[in-house]
Amino acid sequence: MYCLFCQHTDTRVIDSRVSEDGATIRRRRECEACGERFSTLETIELKLPVIIKKDGGREAFDGRKLRTSFDRALQKRPVAEERIEMAMRAVIHRLRMAGEREVPSIVVGECVMAELRKLDHVGYVRFASVYRSFQDVADFREEIEKLESELLVSREQLPLLEAAMESMGHPSIDQGGKHGA
């Protein structure tokens, strides 16, 4: 890499550190000619698909819009920033792994809803109400009833999971998700 100060074509890396989220590497460099030091950030460059909007228009994926969607849905909700970041990364990962050059906006919306459903049910219903254009209280009620029935099914499956684990000689799982003695 060339030197930002003297334009010499050779610099050497004197220190490298991975960021906390593991997505970037900060490199400290020194110019072989003038001795000046500077830092660079190295990130992975992966193309995200172009988003096909409902009106047929196309636009580049915008991570800020994704962030805004999560922020609005989870406004004043007790969800840790770290979990929101993980959910956003999960959406981006799903889009990348789809391997498509273009993705309809509805796919992005469904990915966001899937992650919000795991994070916070109130945030999920908020997002769904806008995304699916709820018209009245009945639409909210219907979505909440779907959520409740899914929670009931997963609660009913826990005893089946415990029984299966015990039959295989594994300790059971209590309601808190911890292994029993």
Swiss-Prot record:
Domain ATP-cone: start-end pairs: 49-139
UniProtKB keywords: ATP-binding, DNA-binding, Metal-binding, Nucleotide-binding, Repressor, Transcription, Transcription regulation, Zinc, Zinc-finger
Cofactor(s) required for function per UniProt: Zn(2+)
Coiled coil: none
GO biological process, one term: negative regulation of DNA-templated transcription
InterPro entries named in the record: ATP-cone_dom, NrdR-like_N, RNR_NrdR-like
Pfam family, any one: Zn_ribbon_NrdR
Domain of life: Bacteria
Keyword Transcription: yes
Zn finger spans (unnamed): 3-34
Disulphides: none
Record carries keyword Glycoprotein: no
Cofactor binding note of this UniProt entry: Binds 1 zinc ion.
GO molecular function: ATP binding; DNA binding; zinc ion binding
Known role: Negatively regulates transcription of bacterial ribonucleotide reductase nrd genes and operons by binding to NrdR-boxes.
PANTHER family linked to this entry: TRANSCRIPTIONAL REPRESSOR NRDR (PTHR30455:SF2)
Protein family per UniProt: Belongs to the NrdR family.
Protein's recorded name: Transcriptional repressor NrdR
Organism: Xylella fastidiosa (strain M12)
Name of encoding gene: nrdR
